[in-house]
Amino acid sequence: MSDFKHIPKYPVQTLGKALDILNYIKDNPSSEGISLTEISSALKIGKSGVHRLLDTLMAYDFVEKINGISPAYRLGWGLFNAGNAVPKQHTLNGANYVPVIEKLCNTFLETTNLGILNNYEAIIICKMEPAARMLRTNTQVGEREPMYATALGKLFMSDLPENEFENYFERTTLTKIP
């Protein structure tokens, strides 16, 4: 992860903690969910605070509670709904790119990804694989990868002004991506 993210001038700490919880659940997927205790311990937020934040996130369907032997939490469908609205607000200059991606995929019989550059990370926004393909890629729509780690990211780097390209590598620690 690079350090190019926006730093708010006047951060709202409670909102930041709620978003940290969402990101923690996202980054630690489990079909059984994640316990309040684990979230509290990992994020160093008191259990009562985590409980109140989770309760609020449940009210917006961003988190759902799994009732089992001990309650656990997972991402809710409200986030899925919110995420699906993103491409509708970013129309790529009004282009309907799906037919183009389909044609490329079917012509060359190769996995075809369309991505955008966001905070110096490549984000896949559309992926198509040919039906007859035996070997599948493990990339997912919505996945973020550092620019240096993917062909798509390197394509974005090739279009950066030289000073921005140099600044990127001065501020980025290169790590092997699994």
Regions found by a protein language model. Give the residues of each.
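Active-site-proximal mixed secondary-structure blocks
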Residues: 173-178
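N-terminal helix-turn-helix
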Residues: 2-89
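Amphipathic alpha-helical effector-binding/dimerization core
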Residues: 69, 74-170
